[in-house]
Amino acid sequence: MKRLSSILAATAVCAGLACTPMAGAAQLTPQQVAGNAAQSTLAPLEVTPELEQQTWYQKYKDDSRVEKLQATSPAMNGRKIPLAVIRAKDENRPTIYLLNGAGGAEQDMDWLKLSDAVDFYHSKNVNVVIPQAGAFSYYTDWVSEPNSQYLKGPQKWETFLTKELPGAIEGHIKADNHRAIAGMSMSATSSLLLAEHNQGFYDAVGSYAGCAATAYPVEHKAVELTVNRGGATAEQMWGPFGSPTNRYNDAMMNHEKLRGTELYISSGSGLAGKEDTFSYNVAKGYNPATAALGSARLQVEGGAIEAGVNYCTHNFKAKLDQAGIPATYNFRNTGTHSWPHWIADLKDSWPVFERAFNK
């Protein structure tokens, strides 16, 4: 029934003189999106002392399912970006670009450390590319260069992820021309933005517990707080509040550019679920003191963040509904801003991605 309503909504949009492609009809190739942009060069991962300390590397360094690579970014002065690539079992398979949240691998808060993404996606015979850098960057192109521990030098992540990397990596893994992009928390916003800025490039988008809006006062403050954690400012990233660059990087304002892309969008309510409780954490093996502190923090801090995300995401749904743009929504009655729910999203979004890839 959900799928039928989505089809009917899309059909209604096409009743006018012009009609955009049905959802999932990605048409552009990496070469078309790249234009004249210089391409990334791939090489085996150089294991620096910093990388060697990151849990994801220790966890998967001997796992043949995960190829450890680095890709240069010409737009970021040749910076070498570490990549974890979950390889499909076969050639000519789709590619998912999976983005970490604010702290990323740099803070040991990434998909490979904290989820079963490798087991899950390997079983689906799909390629997954995870950039293991980009903490606090929103994976966008910044207007000025910050100089902090996590953010130093040119930050041209959109250029890297959409123009420099796809041609190189998809050629290397012998992928087909189907692709999706997904992210959680900070990068849930990024996944929507990169799809909007490159219409027709992604078959599907997964936005797990993020906020589409960035150029409204309250939502912009949330962006500012996130970037501040990385030692930079939102003004360094997108210029002054309400500037053309800020508005360009507001997925709510530019929602029309998501038409024709399969969408999976989720949030919890902010109310504690079973995964946020003391007893759940004790059952997972944490000692009582750690479990008590963790559950209290999740229910207070994580609950407040997710309540804001829930408000923002319902506003986004209203905007998409008004425009007749179909999406698959997962609004949970409970759930804080935390990993158990993003791991569930990784799996719950797969039917949406699979449907898009099979068109």
Regions found by a protein language model. Give the residues of each.
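Non-catalytic cap/lid and distal C-terminal segments of serine-dependent acyl enzymes
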Residues: K2-A10, C14-K359
